[in-house]
A protein has these predicted regions:
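N-terminal targeting or regulatory segments adjacent to alpha/beta-hydrolase or S9 domains
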Residues: 1-48
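Catalytic histidine-centered segment of alpha/beta-hydrolase-like enzymes
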Residues: 312-315, 332, 336-351
């Protein structure tokens, strides 16, 4: 580590401003060196901390089960459908900020779909496969295992959109639908991501590269907030490098940000073309396979959770789902946080999850 020159130190009085600056300079260098060392070992950070077991596995997904932590449990199990972007352990990053740990500690029987990264053999995998095959298979497993007729379907982001699609076609198997930040009405989405998606040639990308590469996905999301993602977060890390709790949380988030799978080419094409560019889902004109998605057919109890400061999905884009469904028992919850803060923060634990848990409890 570089040090302030000793010859210069000898000429400084401890009361001098220059002496104070020298000490601050040395302290900054120490923190930078410590930061470099920690970042080089960041891959060892632990995630996915709540006890669980894989109960079903295919080439497309792993179905994970989290047992409730209370002797008295809710009757209806919850199936969480995560997005196809990034990895699902953001929902279980660390105990004090874990969405899943909070649910199981409240007595809920929770299942989670962990999507696998597609290979080039999977580039023709579409929403028809994800919704009518993979999600349906998971629900059938739970119904058979628990000897029940219905589950609570709980989706996040892209997974919330797919959950709504599923309920429009198969709601006889779903008791309640709860969505977090779904992409529904793209005409109301004013984010940079939505604007970028409107100008993307998804057809050409699919025909050229097949699956959407994870490297391009990461670059795209990082570019949405370039100063924050490229500079500011590392300055904050240096400033807080002696705070172990801050550092561990930073490393877990960083691991998740870089851990991005590819997206199946046909699914990505539909996502961009049908939903963002032509707004077919909101218009009830989107087809997956031979099935027309009509969101107005959803009549089951419905909870929609949106983030007012979401920079990935505008809150009004998500809130539109409340107008689409025909449920008489429906509720929209708005929270002053961001896309990730909604599910993986102290704010979420204190403000979001108590209300979500209460909603589940009274309908399970």
């Amino acid at each position: 580590m570089a040090n302030f020159p000793r010859s210069a130190k000898r000429n400084l009085n401890e009361n001098d401003t220059n002496f104070s600056l020298a000490k601050e300079y040395e302290e900054l260098l120490r923190k930078i060196e410590k930061t470099k060392t920690i970042l080089h070992t960041s891959g060892n950070v632990e995630v996915g901390i709540t006890p669980h077991e894989v109960v079903q596995e295919t080439r497309a997904y792993k179905l994970t089960h989290y047992r409730p932590m209370l002797s008295k449990t809710a009757r209806t199990p919850i199936l969480i459908v995560y997005a196809l972007i990034n990895k699902s352990y953001i929902l279980d990053l660390q105990v004090d900020k874990s969405w899943i740990h909070s649910l199981v500690s409240q007595g809920f029987d929770v299942y989670l779909i962990n999507w696998k990264s597609p290979t080039q053999y999977d580039k023709y995998t579409s929403f028809d496969d994800y919704v009518n095959v993979y999600i349906d298979d998971c629900i059938e497993y739970i119904r058979s295992k628990k000897i029940i007729d219905q589950v609570t379907l709980h989706g996040y982001c892209m997974g919330a959109t797919m959950s709504a699609m599923y309920c429009s076609l198969h709601q006889e198997k779903v008791k309640n639908l709860a969505t977090i930040a779904p992409v529904i009405d793209s005409s109301r989405d004013t984010t940079v991501l939505a604007n970028f998606s409107r100008h993307l040639d998804a057809e050409r990308m699919f025909s050229t590269v097949g699956n959407m590469p994870k490297e391009q996905l990461y670059s795209c999301y990082s570019a949405l907030k370039p100063f924050k993602q490229g500079v500011n977060k590392y300055l904050n890390l240096v400033e807080n490098i002696d705070n172990d709790s801050f550092v561990q949380n930073f490393l877990r988030i960083e691991k998740w940000l870089y851990d991005t799978p590819d997206i199946a080419g046909e699914t990505f094409r539909q996502w961009i073309s049908d939903i963002y560019q032509h707004n077919l889902l909101y218009k009830n004109e989107m087809k997956i396979g031979d099935h027309l998605i009509d969101l107005s057919k959803i009549t089951i109890p419905f909870l929609n959770i949106v983030a007012e400061e979401d920079h990935l999905v505008s809150p009004e884009c998500s809130a539109a789902l409340n107008d689409c469904v025909s449920s008489t028992d429906k509720r929209l919850l708005r929270f002053h946080t961001g896309h990730v803060g909604l599910i993986a923060s102290s704010y979420s634990q204190n403000n979001v999850l108590p209300k979500v848990g209460q909603w589940f409890r009274t309908r399970s």
